[in-house]
C-alpha cells in the first residue's frame, strides 16, 4: 500500500482525485513546480498527518483534503488565492494554527 509520495518537479498540477482513498498515505512532498491542487486530490486519505503547500500553488480544489481524519497540520502560503468548497471538510484533527490560517484566508465550510 502507498505510504509516501514525492511528486516530481516536472509536474505542474495535481489532477482531480489523483490520490483519492489512498488510506495508507502518510506523507506527500509537493514541489515548487505545482501551481494547482485539483478537486478531491487527497479525499479520504485517512493516514495523512501534515501537508506543506509550496509558494507556487494558487488554487486548492474543492474537497482536496476532505475527510483526512488524521491531518493535524497544514501550511498554506499567501500565494493561495482560491480554496474550493469543503477542501478541509471533516478534518477533525487540525491544530489551532492551521484552523486560524484557514480563517485568515476567509475559508469557510460551505
Predicted regions and their residues:
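Structural signature of tandem-repeat unit edges
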Residues: 1-13, 23-36, 46-59, 69-82, ...
Amino acid at each position: 500500500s502507498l505510504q509516501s509520495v514525492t511528486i516530481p518537479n516536472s509536474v505542474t498540477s495535481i489532477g482531480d482525485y489523483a490520490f483519492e482513498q489512498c488510506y495508507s498515505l502518510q506523507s506527500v512532498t509537493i514541489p515548487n513546480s505545482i501551481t494547482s491542487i485539483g478537486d478531491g486530490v487527497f479525499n479520504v486519505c485517512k493516514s495523512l498527518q501534515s501537508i506543506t503547500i509550496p509558494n507556487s500553488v494558487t488554487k486548492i480544489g474543492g474537497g482536496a483534503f476532505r475527510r483526512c481524519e488524521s491531518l493535524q497540520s497544514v501550511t498554506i502560503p499567501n500565494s493561495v488565492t482560491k480554496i474550493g468548497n469543503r477542501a478541509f471538510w471533516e478534518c477533525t484533527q487540525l491544530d489551532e494554527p492551521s484552523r486560524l490560517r484557514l480563517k485568515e484566508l476567509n475559508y469557510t465550510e460551505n
